[in-house]
Design a protein with these regions (language model features):
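N-terminal signal-anchor transmembrane helix
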Residues: 1-11, 191
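Catalytic core of membrane glycerolipid acyltransferases/transacylases, capturing the structured
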Residues: 9-66, 72
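Residue-level preference for the first positions of well-ordered beta-strands
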Residues: 12-14, 81-87, 117
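Hydrophobic/aromatic ligand-binding patch that stacks against planar heteroaromatic rings
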Residues: 28, 53, 76, 107-111
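A cross-family acyltransferase "interaction/gating" segment
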Residues: 50, 97-165
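Short, hinge-like loop/turn segments at secondary-structure boundaries
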Residues: 55-58, 80, 134-137
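Catalytic-site beta-strand/loop segments enriched in glycine and acidic/polar residues
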Residues: 77-106
């Protein structure tokens, strides 16, 4: 893990990360210097032990069928001064590579008055690929290999940069920032 100091100690923060597996949000939350909030689809809260764990780590249930609920929830949390983790790909990757961001994040980035921190995640896909019902223990349990997990918090910046950008410009900028942070995560992953 690197770049932890890039997460502001106070005030609203939008952390924008790539989404490799179910491990991403809790691991980013554990690595963060602040207690994060993040959205998780409501169906994940049906398994009681898992629900307790992710709720304890800051998960907020949302119904993915109601598109605007998630945006409203994130804006409310930011207005209350919370740091919120978002995965704008919308779902876990099927291939381990970063997917195009959904357009909703552009509206959120434009409306939010906060600090934005790009977050790169590498190796979580190997630990728990989308196609598997259960995690693969080797990336976490075995000695250091290029298959370990790396998390990098990129340089923070103000959401004000998005005020004059159109949707496509915002999406491009966010994707570039998260891709840069992911490069940092891969470097950390290879060092561990």
């Amino acid at each position: 893990m690197s770049g932890r100091h890039n997460v502001p100690k106070t005030g609203p923060v939008l952390l924008v990360a790539n989404h490799e597996s179910h491990f991403d949000p809790p691991l980013v939350g554990i690595c963060s210097p602040r207690q994060l909030r993040y959205l998780a689809r409501s169906t994940l809260f049906k398994l009681k032990p898992f629900a307790w764990t992710i709720r304890t780590l800051g998960a907020v249930p949302i119904d993915r069928e109601v598109g605007t609920d998630g945006l409203k929830t994130v804006l409310r949390l930011l207005e209350e001064g919370h740091p919120v983790l978002m995965s704008p790909e919308g779902t876990r990757t099927e291939t381990g590579t970063m997917q195009p961001f959904k357009p909703g994040i552009s509206l959120l980035a434009k409306r939010a008055k906060c600090t934005v921190v790009p977050v790169g995640v590498a190796g979580c896909y190997n630990a728990w690929p989308r196609q598997h019902k259960l995690p693969t223990p080797s990336p976490i349990m075995l000695p250091a290999t290029p298959r370990n997990i790396g998390i990098h918090f990129g340089e923070p910046y103000s959401s004000e940069v998005y005020r004059t950008m159109d949707r496509d410009g915002i999406l491009r900028h966010l994707e570039e920032k998260v891709a840069e942070a992911r490069v940092g995560a891969v470097k950390i992953q290879r060092k561990t």
